[in-house]
């Protein structure tokens, strides 16, 4: 972020005294240089800045120098030659200075918000400041691109103020720069804290504290000492069986070869044999428990299934079965069917009976109509089934135009189908009439109720 130095043209203009003596490039009223000012003159050639003319003409309609009549700006003319001549005067860059806050007065104007006792002082920086000489009209463009302007470091926490041309080298070494640990790959570590981080980083390789000459990641050092380090003091592997010798891990093999452990091995084998026997017994007991639990799960599942299925079955007995059959891509499917060829719905399992709905897009016998039938597939003669059923052809544009046909009581024998051969003219079934949805689906609502058996009264 760049830091602007507040300045006046007096701070940077060359040959100020000479220019002021000529009285050509200063306003004779406010005595300021005409930097970024518009200069106007009366008919007699007396000039002043626009701001001074405005204040004067508010009270007096006359020239401030010769007292000639000036009614408005229309009586004045712009002094462009003077303005342009001043624009070509040379000055230095404000960034050729260093700015310091000093106590007491100075020949420079205080910045906004600074008191008279706490003012700024510009000190020429011959070594590091900008060396360019520029013309007055180039000041703004030069300051935008000047490589000697003051900037702050962009890294959070760093309050360093430096010149832009040294920013890159500073940021490469800035202690607040975020760097990545080569070991744990954390990428939020300040550069100045990296060495401290290495002292606690769990991934940094460190020397084993037992002098085994192996470097281990800090996080794994305890595991290394307990399980791998050749200098760790460990007991004989037959310690529990009676050999109480302790040695370095690197000496264990030599100890086992040098000392006869046959008696200890016998004790260990006996112990392991007992453990194997106990494990087998525990294994058999667990298998028995698993079998018992499996039986309980089966019984529990059957009970739950009955609780779920029974209410649904009772509802179907009382109110009947309702569902929808949605036939996708009906237009192309219907076109592929020949006369008397049917579309069959998935099987409907209702109270142990299997039903199926059949649609004939081009009719079973009546070629101009769509036909709908209901079939029961698992009735064997001489048995029969009394059924109440209905089909509703849904109009998706206007539900009130949907067509419903109902059979109050039909006796089904074997797998014969019952329904309506002339349900609706086939040519009417399209999207425009509402019988097909926009995605070419035909919707049929199905209602089926199995009627209770009727029994003859008992007589005696």
Curated annotation (Swiss-Prot):
An example Gene Ontology CC term for this record: cytoplasm
PROSITE patterns: MATH (PS50144), ZF_TRAF (PS50145)
Main location as per UniProt: cytoplasm
Keywords: Coiled coil, Cytoplasm, Developmental protein, Metal-binding, Repeat, Zinc, Zinc-finger
Its job: Probable adapter protein and signal transducer that links members of the tumor necrosis factor receptor family to different signaling pathways by association with the receptor cytoplasmic domain and kinases.
Family: Belongs to the TNF receptor-associated factor family. A subfamily.
Descriptive protein name: RING finger protein DG17
